[in-house]
Swiss-Prot record:
Modified residues (N6-lipoyllysine): 63
Name under which the protein is recorded: Glycine cleavage system H protein
Function: The glycine cleavage system catalyzes the degradation of glycine. The H protein shuttles the methylamine group of glycine from the P protein to the T protein.
One Pfam family of this chain: GCV_H
GO biological process entries: glycine decarboxylation via glycine cleavage system
Cofactor(s) recorded in Swiss-Prot or TrEMBL: (R)-lipoate
CDD domains to which the protein is assigned, alphabetical: GCS_H
Description of how the protein assembles with itself and partners: The glycine cleavage system is composed of four proteins: P, T, L and H.
Family: Belongs to the GcvH family.
CC terms in the record's Gene Ontology section: cytosol; glycine cleavage complex
Length: 127
C-alpha cells in the first residue's frame, strides 16, 4: 500500500495535498483497494461550498457506493473532469491522475486536524 509522507489524511480515507493557498483532495490507495473497481465518480461543481467532515460526492465501485467526505471547509475551485470518462484512474493512480477536487480553504489551519501518513497507516493497520 502506498501512503505518501507529504500528504495529510482523514479517518474516512481521503488525502490532502497543500498547494499554495489551495488543497487538492482525493481518496487513498487503501480506500481504492477496499472498494474494488471504480465505475463512477460523482463530484461537486466548481464554486460549490464544502464543509469539513461532510459529504461532497461519491465513488461507485462494482461492490458498493461510498461517500466522499471533505477534509477541510472551503470553496471548490477545480474539479477533475477526467474522472467522468475515466473513473478507473482512481484504481490506477489514486494520488496523481485521480485527484477529485481542489478547494480554496476558509481556514488552512484546519489541515492540522488531519492525520499524518504515520497516523493514517497506524489507523488502517489496527483494522
Amino acid at each position: 500500500m502506498n501512503t505518501p509522507k507529504e500528504l495529510r489524511y482523514t479517518k474516512e480515507h481521503e488525502w490532502v495535498r497543500v498547494e499554495g493557498e489551495n488543497v487538492r483532495i482525493g481518496i487513498t490507495d487503501y480506500a481504492q483497494s477496499e472498494l474494488g473497481d471504480i465505475v463512477f465518480v460523482e463530484l461537486p461543481e466548481v464554486g460549490a461550498e464544502v464543509t469539513a467532515n461532510e459529504p461532497f460526492g461519491s465513488v461507485e465501485s462494482v461492490k458498493t457506493v461510498s461517500e466522499l467526505y471533505a477534509p477541510i471547509s472551503g470553496t471548490v475551485v477545480e474539479v477533475n473532469e477526467a474522472l467522468n470518462d475515466h473513473p478507473e484512474y482512481v484504481n490506477e493512480s489514486p494520488y496523481d491522475k485521480a485527484w477529485m477536487i481542489v478547494v480554496k480553504p476558509n481556514d488552512l489551519s484546519e489541515i492540522d486536524n488531519l492525520l499524518t501518513a504515520e497516523q493514517y497507516e497506524a489507523m488502517i493497520n489496527e483494522g
